[in-house]
């Protein structure tokens, strides 16, 4: 399955242009998806801005301390995510993990008042239930 992975608010907390703190459980679940054979493509608004922030995000993801397999692909521009619907994701072999995807579980962002980020623990449970993970 192709998984389009957002960065800010998904892998890390919202802090753009800086890179925010790691979103709890993100790297563990992303690594499990990679090990299961899913193809991860970075899909971020950082691709729309020519300020070096896309390269910074890729460098961050590929840091050896994060334990991920290399993520080298990214969309040329941000693709607006479809809803977090695992039945449809299985049908079409693509999944969007993105804090702006409809129906994706969210938790409060610790750094921005009234902000939210992906709830990776709940996402992981849903992926296991759908036999994606």
Predicted regions and their residues:
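C-terminal cap/substrate-recognition subdomain and adjoining C-terminal extension
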Residues: 39, 52-133
């Amino acid at each position: 399955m192709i998984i389009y992975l957002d960065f800010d608010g998904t892998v890390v907390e919202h802090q753009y242009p800086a890179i925010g703190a790691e979103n709890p459980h993100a790297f563990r679940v992303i690594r499990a998806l990679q090990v299961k054979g899913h193809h991860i493509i970075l899909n971020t608004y950082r691709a729309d801005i020519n300020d070096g922030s896309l390269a910074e995000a890729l460098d961050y993801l590929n840091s050896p301390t994060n334990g991920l397999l290399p993520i080298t692909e990214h969309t040329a521009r941000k693709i607006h995510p479809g809803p977090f619907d695992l039945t449809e994701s299985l049908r079409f072999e693509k999944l969007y993990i993105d804090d702006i995807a409809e129906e994706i579980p969210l938790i409060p962002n610790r750094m921005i008042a009234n902000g939210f980020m992906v709830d990776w623990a709940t996402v992981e449970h849903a992926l296991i239930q759908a036999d994606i993970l």
